[in-house]
């Protein structure tokens, strides 16, 4: 059997300015030492955001745990949300992670598209410049 924790009452959200990752539910399968995360990625910008669907990881305390599998599209259209599932199994060195559901998790993913560049505003006045001499054969 699996244990479950839902976050409807107090969502765990990792905010990255133009997008955020919200944990909806986490399931723990103890015999397999696997946690399955159900998360929502929300693009808050007007630009498409691309990410590596195989790059999900979770921070619990000071440690990072990398996904064993994911079901994710890899692209977030502007002003949209996407449901993603991914699993964490064991530790990178092959041991058991024994991660409890009560941890305060942060979800991370590797982004492919660069963040939007801020618009540059200047107060400089543009003055047209006349040529110093007239080109030949011109009045």
Q: What name fits each language-model region?
A:
Residues 36, 47-55, 95-102:
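Short, hydrophobic/aromatic beta-strand segments
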Residues 41-45:
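Asparagine-centered strand-capping/turn motif at beta-strand->loop junctions
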Residues 35-37, 82:
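Structural beta-strand segments of beta-rich domains
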Residues 63-121, 126-139:
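Short, solvent-exposed, Trp/other aromatic-anchored flexible loops in extracytoplasmic proteins
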Residues 1-14:
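A eukaryote-biased signal for short, well-structured alpha-helical docking elements
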Residues 22-33, 75:
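Short, solvent-exposed beta-strand/turn "edge" segments of beta-rich domains on protein surfaces
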Residues 16-21:
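N-terminal edge beta-strand
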Residues 46-49, 57-70:
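Short aromatic-acidic-glycine turn motif
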């Amino acid at each position: 059997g699996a244990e479950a924790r839902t976050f409807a009452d107090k969502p765990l959200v990792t905010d990255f300015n133009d997008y955020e990752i919200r944990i909806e539910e986490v399931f723990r399968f103890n015999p397999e030492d696997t946690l399955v995360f159900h998360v929502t990625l929300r693009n808050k910008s007007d630009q498409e955001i691309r990410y590596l669907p195989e790059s999900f990881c979770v921070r619990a305390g000071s440690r990072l745990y990398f996904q064993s599998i994911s079901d994710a599209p890899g692209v977030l259209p502007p002003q949209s949300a996407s449901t993603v599932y991914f699993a964490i199994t064991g530790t990178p060195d092959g041991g058991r992670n024994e991660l409890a559901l009560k941890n305060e998790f942060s979800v991370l993913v590797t982004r492919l598209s660069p963040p939007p560049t801020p618009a540059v505003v200047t107060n400089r006045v543009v003055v047209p410049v006349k040529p110093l001499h007239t080109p030949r054969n011109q009045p």
